[in-house]
């Protein structure tokens, strides 16, 4: 009896040691795993950041992966032009050449088959080139803040010959500029500085935000993306609400949420290149009537940054780490993410009492 009990005790002790080792190993693994949550409104550049992580830390896009983006890029180009043509009537803009009205009819007749096949036929290419070159269409494009048009429109429409070629294979820049609405939750894992990162991208549309709560558990850091150039634009969802106002409200709710008291908060003030171009034409007062500064990139960017940082109601205990970014610029994102990682590591060490 005593011998049997001793044997059972030894086995229990062995099991206990195995469990302890497993728990220590799991604890160390969790310390080495960084869960990054990408948040922000639609069109703020979150999905482009995910693509950049794949390029910088996961080997990029091989030939087959590049080919898979061709139908999306074709769709983006066609969709951009059809949006411009539809907006002509609403903005009361006429074609410079009346013959383009027939091309517009042809555009809508030919786009369905082209989108389903993922290719632009020579006939459709001719139609698209003539429409895009028309001064009336260009005037409509210059007023794109009055309707919904993606940032990549001019990039693709200025290069129709290349993307319509039968042997077209998307470049990395083509892929970075492609736009596909994120629905659901997209996870991307990669290793950097001996840490495993799990980056979680959640759709930014209002209808998608109810899913965010499912991602909050165990978050190490939040990267909140802001569309700097969206200060004169309205939401897709209601065509009434300012995109910048929506972004500020959303950031306020995240920054001051009790879930994230010990979570590093990083602010990506994105699309700085588009802000620099737009601010010369459209004043910041269209969004911030109280703004008294010059309509220069430097002053406007700092003013917008301050609007977000001032929402932090816990400045003594919570710091916001702000960076101006261009999500389509790989070198910029690589530099910024390196700095972000150092901040996350330092804050993690403080949190577990090792720093």
Curated annotation (Swiss-Prot):
Record-linked SUPFAM superfamilies: P-loop containing nucleoside triphosphate hydrolases (SSF52540), Transducin (alpha subunit), insertion domain (SSF47895)
Single GO MF descriptor: GTP binding
Topological type in the membrane: Lipid-anchor
Residue numbers spanned by region G3 motif: 197-206
Principal subcellular localization: membrane
UniProt xrefs under CDD domains: G-alpha
Compositional bias annotation for Basic and acidic residues: 1-14
Domain (G-alpha) ranges: 32-355
Subunit structure: G-proteins are composed of 3 units; alpha, beta and gamma. The alpha chain contains the guanine nucleotide binding site. Interacts with ADGRB2.
Assigned protein family: Belongs to the G-alpha family. G(i/o/t/z) subfamily.
Protein name, UniProt field: Guanine nucleotide-binding protein G(z) subunit alpha
């Amino acid at each position: 009896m005593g011998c049997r009990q001793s044997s059972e005790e030894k086995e229990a002790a062995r099991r206990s040691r195995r469990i302890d080792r497993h728990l220590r190993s799991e604890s160390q693994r969790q310390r080495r795993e960084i869960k990054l949550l990408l948040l922000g409104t639609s069109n703020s550049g979150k999905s482009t950041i995910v693509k950049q992580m794949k390029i910088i830390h996961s080997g990029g896009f091989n030939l087959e992966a590049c080919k898979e983006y061709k139908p999306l890029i074709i769709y983006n180009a066609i969709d951009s032009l059809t949006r411009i043509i539809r907006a002509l009537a609403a903005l009361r803009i006429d074609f410079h050449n009346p013959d383009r009205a027939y091309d517009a009819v042809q555009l809508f007749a030919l786009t369905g088959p082209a989108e389903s096949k993922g290719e632009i036929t020579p006939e459709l290419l001719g139609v698209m080139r003539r429409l895009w070159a028309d001064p009336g269409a260009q005037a409509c494009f210059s007023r794109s803040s009055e309707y919904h048009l993606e940032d990549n429109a001019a990039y693709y429409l200025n290069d129709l010959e290349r993307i319509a070629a039968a042997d077209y294979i998307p470049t990395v820049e083509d892929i970075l500029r492609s736009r596909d609405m994120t629905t659901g939750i997209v996870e991307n894992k990669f290793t950097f500085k001996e840490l495993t990162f799990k980056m979680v991208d959640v759709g930014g549309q209002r209808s998608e935000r109810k899913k965010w709560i499912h991602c909050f558990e165990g978050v190490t850091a939040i990267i909140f993306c802001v569309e700097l150039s969206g200060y004169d634009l309205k939401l897709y969802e209601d065509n009434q609400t300012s995109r910048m106002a929506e972004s500020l409200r959303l950031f306020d709710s995240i920054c001051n949420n009790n879930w994230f008291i010990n979570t590093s908060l990083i602010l990506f003030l994105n699309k700085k290149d588009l802000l620099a171009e737009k601010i010369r034409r459209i004043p910041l007062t269209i969004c911030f009537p109280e703004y008294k500064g010059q309509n220069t990139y430097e002053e406007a960017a700092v003013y917008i940054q301050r609007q977000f940082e001032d929402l932090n109601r816990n400045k003594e205990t919570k710091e916001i780490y702000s960076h101006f970014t261009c999500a389509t610029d790989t070198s910029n994102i690589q530099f910024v993410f390196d700095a972000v990682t150092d901040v996350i590591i330092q804050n993690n060490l403080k949190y577990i009492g090792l720093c």
